[in-house]
Amino acid sequence: MKTFVLVSCLLVFTQIIYALDIKEISIMNRILEKCIRTVPKRENDPINPLRNVNVWYCAFTKRGIFTPKGVNTKQYINYCEKTAISPADIKLCKKIASKCVKKVYDRPGPIIERSKNLLSCVLKKGLLELTVYGKKK
């Protein structure tokens, strides 16, 4: 029985560790800190800077996910694999990200505006809460 419990615990921890890309999270944390400091604060910005579309736009632009030509869709959706907390969260994260990409990029408009609308969509649908960033303040 003890062996079964130990193996079960190891499987759970392996899934959690597998789901997170610690190196990428560390890089993104440094980028987010810089973006939080440099993005001008506006009157209607949320108290938590991680809920600010402009902060995420800054960070994803620095990571090369948002470019002048638009969003690198594959890289954006696969970012869920690097930051989602559990395998179930990865699946839901990808689903939300895919729906928002389709919804936003099927419409005409400037690339920057569409990229920010994409971020607004995923934040409103709760994608952040599925990742390690949902736990930060």
From Swiss-Prot:
Its main location: secreted. The keyword DNA damage does not apply. InterPro entries: Ant_venon_allerg_soli_2/4_sf, Sol_i_2/4. Pfam families: Sol_i_2. Residues 1-19 form the signal peptide. GO terms for cellular component: extracellular region. It is found in: Secreted. Changing W56L: In Sol i 4.02. Expressed by the venom gland. Keywords: Allergen, Secreted, Signal. Monomer. Belongs to the ant venom allergen 2/4 family. This is Venom allergen 4. The lineage of its organism: Eukaryota, Metazoa, Ecdysozoa, Arthropoda, Hexapoda.
